[in-house]
C-alpha cells in the first residue's frame, strides 16, 4: 500500500471527510513522526510498533564491483520494532 492508497481507503471509510482533509491528516501524521525522529525522539504507537533512530558507526566497507576498500561514514538510520498486536496479526493470531 502506498500513501495515496492509504488516503483513498481512509476517505472511503469516512465519507463525512473530504479526501483533501484526509490527505492533510495523513501528511501531518507522517511529518510529526519524521520531526520526532529527527529530534532524536522515539515514536511509539501502542500495539503497532515503535520507530527510533539508531546510529551506525563509521566503518571500512568494500565496493562489491571492484573489491576496493571504501570508508563508510557514520550515519543515523530509522529503525522499526513491530508491536505485539502487529506480530500476532501477521502470525494468524487475532486479537
Swiss-Prot record:
GO terms for molecular function: DNA binding; structural constituent of chromatin. InterPro entries: Hist_DNA-bd (IPR000119), Histone-like_DNA-bd_CS (IPR020816), IHF-like_DNA-bd_dom_sf (IPR010992), IHF_beta (IPR005685). The keyword DNA-binding applies. PANTHER family: DNA-BINDING PROTEIN HU, INTEGRATION HOST FACTOR SUBUNIT BETA. Keywords: DNA recombination, DNA-binding, Transcription, Transcription regulation, Translation regulation. Heterodimer of an alpha and a beta chain. Coiled coil: none annotated. GO terms for biological process: DNA recombination; regulation of DNA-templated transcription; regulation of translation. It comes from Jannaschia sp. (strain CCS1). GO terms for cellular component: chromosome; cytosol. Belongs to the bacterial histone-like protein family. This is Integration host factor subunit beta. This protein is one of the two subunits of integration host factor, a specific DNA-binding protein that functions in genetic recombination as well as in transcriptional and translational control.
Amino acid at each position: 500500500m502506498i500513501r495515496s492508497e492509504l488516503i483513498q481507503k481512509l476517505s472511503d471509510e469516512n465519507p463525512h471527510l473530504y479526501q483533501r482533509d484526509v490527505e492533510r491528516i495523513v501528511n501531518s501524521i507522517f511529518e510529526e513522526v519524521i520531526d520526532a525522529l529527527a529530534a532524536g525522539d522515539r515514536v511509539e504507537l501502542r500495539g503497532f510498533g515503535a520507530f527510533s533512530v539508531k546510529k551506525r558507526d563509521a566503518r571500512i566497507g568494500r565496493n562489491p564491483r571492484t573489491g576496493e576498500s571504501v570508508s563508510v561514514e557514520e550515519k543515523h538510520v530509522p529503525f522499526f520494532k513491530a508491536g505485539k498486536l502487529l506480530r500476532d496479526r501477521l502470525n494468524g493470531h487475532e486479537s
